[in-house]
């Protein structure tokens, strides 16, 4: 019988104001990111993904020590920034301008704070080939 290999990548999806007010949601994000960094430090083969770029801004502002850890994990290609949205949108109601703005704001933030991300940003925000 052939052995099968299964790859698991940790992910966090948080709707910061669905169940909580803004500050409770922000607290959930910061606690989740700290826990993710702890798990990455504990398990060297683990990878983590997240998709709401505004969560990185919140972390930089309110938990800079966690943000430093995240930046180290991003540089080590163990923390993957995926999706490219500023925050996960409701895709049923917004206009195309809203979607464009989400990507534009995210690209600006990623460019400013993470640079090229070794091509990862292009993969995340759909800017491949630019």
Predicted segment positions?
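Carbohydrate-active enzymes and regulators
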Residues: 1-130
